[in-house]
From Swiss-Prot:
Gene: prcA
Assembly mode: The 20S proteasome core is composed of 14 alpha and 14 beta subunits that assemble into four stacked heptameric rings, resulting in a barrel-shaped structure. The two inner rings, each composed of seven catalytic beta subunits, are sandwiched by two outer rings, each composed of seven alpha subunits. The catalytic chamber with the active sites is on the inside of the barrel. Has a gated structure, the ends of the cylinder being occluded by the N-termini of the alpha-subunits. Is capped by the proteasome-associated ATPase, ARC.
Pathway assignment: Protein degradation; proteasomal Pup-dependent pathway
Matches recorded under CDD domains: proteasome_protease_HslV (cd01906)
Stretch list, region Disordered: 231-260
Keywords of this entry: Cytoplasm, Proteasome
Stated family: Belongs to the peptidase T1A family.
Any single GO CC term annotated in Swiss-Prot or TrEMBL for this entry: cytoplasm
The UniProt record lists the keyword tRNA processing: no
Protein's name according to its UniProt entry: Proteasome subunit alpha
GO molecular function: threonine-type endopeptidase activity
Record's keyword annotation contains Cytoplasm: yes
Length: 260
């Protein structure tokens, strides 16, 4: 007589967590940090078309790592929810905390009820409405629905430990935008360094955007081209600076399966 396969609940949760963490670690790093006028997002992203950073609503931005099709589905769902709430009530009734809670609930439900968890990690950033003097806020949402507000910066994806250590050493509160970009780029470069003195890989293309509190309505702005080059450190010379020009994907890679 054969017995059905049995795994304890604890083992199932451990297996799901390990699967999600491995998927997230394969993605390239994203840094979100606060600066004097809002929130800065800097992502290592060699792709022109697959964006890891996005506007969600007037004063709210979104960044993610992991499986593109999974976090893009969450991003679009958040945009639709925010549009409906802003239309039904008032645009000021849409907040980053509400969106972060919705993402956390969705990821928690998927993690607990579906066979495969989403291999994603999210960051929701928010700046105060124009004319208000409130500090920017960053929320981290993990694959299992855990949510935490971070006071200064968030690091997700890839080799996070050296990126975090670099920010601990260099980050200064209320820095100017150029300085903040320098902190983020230096941290991302630390994440690409080889272990034990071995040669690391070059930092790929950058996707850069900000939430600017000084903008009257829509705070989100992408930084590209000459504007981005003027903000980059003098010793930074990647092949791309706008998240473009990636070589053709390896066989089997697609928009639906690619890790970002």
């Amino acid at each position: 007589m054969t017995f059905p396969y049995y795994a304890s609940v604890e083992q199932l949760m451990r297996d799901r967590s390990e699967l999600a963490r491995k998927g997230i670690s394969r993605g390239r790093s994203v840094v979100a940090l606060t600066y004097t006028d809002g929130v800065l997002f800097v992502a290592e992203n060699p792709s022109n078309s697959l964006q890891k950073v996005s506007e969600v609503y007037d004063r709210v931005g979104f960044a993610a790592v992991g499986k593109f099709n999974e976090f893009d589905r969450l991003r679009r769902g958040g945009i639709q929810w925010a549009d409906m709430r802003g239309y039904a009530y008032d645009r000021r009734d849409v907040s980053g905390r509400q969106l972060a809670n919705i993402y956390a609930e969705a990821l928690g439900t998927i993690f607990n009820e579906q066979a495969k968890p989403y291999e994603v990690e999210l960051c929701v950033g928010e700046v105060a409405h124009y004319g208000r003097d409130t500090e920017p806020v960053l929320y981290r949402i993990t694959y299992d629905g855990s949510i935490a507000d971070e006071p200064h910066w968030v690091v997700m994806g890839g080799n996070t430990e050296p990126v975090i250590n670099s920010l601990k050493e260099s980050y200064v509160e209320d820095s100017a935008l150029k300085d903040a970009v320098g902190f983020a780029v230096k941290a991302l470069q630390a994440g690409t360094a080889g272990a034990n003195g071995s040669e690391g890989r070059a930092l790929g293309g950058l996707e850069v955007a900000v939430l600017e509190q000084s903008r009257p309505r829509r705070a989100f702005r992408r930084i590209k081209g000459a504007a981005l080059e003027a903000l980059l450190p003098e010793d930074f010379s990647p092949g791309q600076t706008e998240g473009g020009g990636d070589p053709a994907p390896e066989s089997g890679d697609s928009k639906d399966a690619k890790d970002n």
